């Protein structure tokens, strides 16, 4: 039986998010805007998954929906931010 390591899982999500954010930044500098947005979305998704794991002590759900992940995070997120997350989710397509 495999034991779920919360700390290791959070570290994985955050390190992966940092890598994706760096990739997105490079794409932005080279004016490849759609791809930069895609990687920015991935970074946000992974940060939210790390927060979900931290707050629930369970694996993050298998989803790309930023609004769904935000709702699972147990954070009090202003509606305007949730609206932005919904818009960002469109760039994962």
What are these model-predicted stretches?
Residues 1-93:
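Terminal alpha-helical segments
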């Amino acid at each position: 039986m495999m034991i779920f390591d919360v700390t290791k899982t959070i570290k994985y999500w955050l390190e992966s998010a940092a890598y994706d954010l760096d990739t997105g930044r490079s794409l932005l500098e080279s004016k490849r805007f759609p791809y930069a947005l895609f990687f920015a979305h991935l970074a946000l998704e992974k940060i939210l998954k790390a927060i979900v794991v931290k707050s629930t002590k369970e694996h993050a759900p298998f989803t790309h929906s930023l609004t769904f992940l935000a709702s699972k995070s147990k954070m009090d997120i202003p509606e305007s931010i949730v609206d932005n997350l919904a818009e960002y989710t469109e760039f994962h397509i």
